[in-house]
């Protein structure tokens, strides 16, 4: 890694010496001189010698890691936690290694949902053809038939998939804090049916063929002369980009295209689809949601699109550091009123768990999750959330509105 930086420094000195010998050239001459010098070095080969191949194991055993009895990821030989900087000064390679491990973690969690939590995988769309892109969710056997209670879990956005709250926590902390497994097990013990959404599984990536790459650049109705000028500019731009890529990405990766999953192309679409085809069809008299971060936004969008159905079916909603915004999402007055009575948002805060946290928005009450770390809010608020659900159901059965938490000084909002 240090070698090619030294080469670049040497090239800079050469250019400066050339300037001193020839006087002060204009910008065009400087650029020409530098390009000429750099063109004599095969940067592709230089970087490939420095960066190891982007080839990683596809199993935990291959990485020499496993989860111990406490659910912590540990090295099989040393017993040490995961080390990100496996190779000094190779951040990109280390990041790719981390991402490869993350994909294995995702599959591992899927396995735990089926084996330990006894959930079943259900394919989406429900009428998917053999060749179209597909997604899936996880459900307990009684998810649609349980007459009493149903728990629905929605994680945030990013790389996390069904069953996860935060990949970072799974790798660096443990399975309990980073996955939804404690929620699923607790819900099962207390007689809930369970549905685990998978809102980030929106598309599959396939490698582009040469014909598709060519088509994407040729598909234009512009006049030939204009297209030629445009092509020339694009070629020059590509040449400069490729020149830079030799530094940033010496091992050129394959060009891919995204094929979106029908009716599940975004977290919001996914939530509505699962509601329409599963949750709304369930027998449960009381449906409860736990939605983390962007999952809260997806729930609010669901409520906007299916307001009457949600009000009739959902008993309470626990949000954890939700990023929803009732103004930006244009949630109506009746939705905001319902959220104030039936939702609670456990937010990252330095205050003790369940302490009231002031909010400027006229939506659901906010209380502390007992942690300042966003990704830990679902885990730290875990016991309070199930208590909130129990109180909500008791209040519904006795026709008395529940207090969102055990706090005092409930925030009063003025309608604007």
UniProtKB/Swiss-Prot annotation:
Q: Which SUPFAM superfamilies match?
A: alpha/beta-Hydrolases
The catalytic site is made up of 293 (nucleophile)
Can you list the GO cellular component terms from the UniProt entry? cytoplasm; endoplasmic reticulum; nucleus
Q: Give a GO biological-process term.
A: RNA splicing
Q: Which Pfam families match?
A: Arb2
Q: Which residues form the signal peptide?
A: 1-23
The annotated region (Disordered) lies at: 211-248
Query: Record keywords: Cytoplasm included?
Result: yes
Tell me where it resides. Nucleus; Cytoplasm
The biased composition feature labelled Basic and acidic residues covers: 223-236
Carbohydrate-modified residues: 397
What InterPro entries does the database record attribute to this sequence?
A: AB_hydrolase_fold, Arb2, Arb2_dom
Quote the function comment for this protein: May play role in the regulation of alternative splicing. May have hydrolase activity.
Q: Which family does it belong to?
A: Belongs to the ARB2A family.
What name does the UniProt record give this protein? Cotranscriptional regulator ARB2A homolog
Question: Coding gene?
Answer: ARB2A
């Amino acid at each position: 890694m240090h070698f090619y930086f030294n080469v670049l420094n040497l090239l800079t000195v050469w250019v400066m010496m050339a300037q001193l010998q020839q006087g002060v050239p204009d910008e065009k001459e400087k650029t020409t001189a530098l390009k000429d010098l750099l063109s004599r070095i095969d940067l592709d080969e230089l970087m490939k010698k420095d960066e190891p191949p982007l080839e990683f194991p596809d199993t935990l055993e291959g990485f020499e890691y496993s989860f111990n009895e406490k659910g912590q990821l540990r090295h099989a030989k040393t017993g040490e936690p995961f080390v990100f900087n496996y190779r000094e000064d190779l951040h990109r390679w280390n990041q790719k290694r981390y991402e490869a491990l993350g994909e294995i973690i995702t599959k591992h969690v899927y396995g735990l949902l089926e084996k330990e939590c006894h959930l079943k995988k259900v394919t989406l769309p429900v009428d998917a053809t053999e060749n179209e892109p597909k997604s899936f969710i996880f459900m307990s056997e009684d998810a649609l038939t349980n007459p009493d209670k149903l728990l629905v879990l929605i994680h945030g956005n990013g790389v996390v998939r069904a069953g996860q709250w935060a990949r970072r926590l799974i790798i660096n902390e443990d399975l309990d804090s980073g996955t939804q497994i404690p929620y699923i097990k607790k819900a099962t013990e207390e007689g809930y049916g369970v549905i685990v959404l998978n809102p980030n599984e929106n598309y599959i990536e396939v490698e582009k063929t040469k014909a598709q790459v060519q088509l994407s650049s040729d598909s234009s109705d512009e006049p030939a002369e204009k297209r030629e000028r445009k092509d020339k500019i694009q070629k020059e731009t590509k040449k400069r980009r490729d020149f830079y890529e030799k530094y940033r990405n010496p091992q050129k990766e394959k060009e891919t295209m995204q094929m979106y999953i029908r009716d599940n192309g975004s977290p919001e679409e996914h939530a509505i689809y699962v509601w329409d085809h599963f949750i709304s069809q369930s027998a449960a008299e009381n449906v409860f949601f736990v939605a983390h971060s962007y999952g809260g936004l997806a729930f609010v969008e669901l409520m906007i699109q299916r307001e009457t159905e949600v009000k009739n079916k959902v008993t309470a909603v626990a949000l954890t550091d939700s990023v929803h915004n009732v103004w930006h999402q244009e949630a109506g007055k009746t939705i905001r009123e319902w959220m104030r009575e039936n939702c609670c948002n456990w937010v990252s805060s330095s205050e003790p768990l369940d302490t009231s946290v002031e909010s400027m928005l006229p939506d659901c009450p906010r209380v502390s999750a007992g942690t300042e770390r966003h990704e830990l809010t679902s885990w730290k608020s875990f016991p309070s959330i199930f208590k909130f659900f129990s109180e909500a159901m008791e209040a519904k059965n006795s026709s008395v509105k529940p207090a969102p938490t055990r706090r005092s000084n409930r925030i009063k909002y003025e309608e604007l």
